Amino acid sequence: MILIIFKYLKKIFFLILRSSIEFKKPSLKKVLIFDKTNSEILQKYLRNKYCILHTRNEKINIFIVIKNIIKFKFSKIEYYNTYIEFVKPKIIITAIDNNPAFYLLKKKFNQKKILIQMGWKSPIYDKSIFTLKKGVTKVVKNKRYNVDYIFVYNSEIGKFFKNLNAKKIIKIGSIKSNFFKIK
């Protein structure tokens, strides 16, 4: 156990050296954006009612890290879940559809989990949730995956996402291209 704690503390130390650090407890927000990547598109719709959970080590919340050390929680998923417990969002939304961590987040406080597709899917580039078997693209199934709403480009892509335990899949086209006026 001591070896695990030491490895975790060493990893945190090196992350802190490379990351921006936040010391205060996360504040309550109605919406939590999971992963800063592509969040600028979501921010246009959300105004100031959101916060961002940084998932690529660009920013680390020391308050959450300390809480997790005290509780002997050492994984990234546990860090994310603890962060969510403090923010208490009604909605967790992401524009990153190929991060398995999003699908594995615990559902507490009756929040809704929403995923918006931002790119085309391919098992060549998205090996985290897609696989290619005998020339056929399939979704990596996991009983623990869960998401309430997935907004996809079209019904064909929607068929792939059905296997991610989504309650509802909605076709909206590309949210990025919807920012441009047709001439």
Feature map (PLM): residue ranges:
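Active-site and donor-binding regions of nucleotide-sugar-utilizing enzymes
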Residues: 4-180
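Donor-nucleotide binding loops and adjacent catalytic segments primarily
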Residues: 183
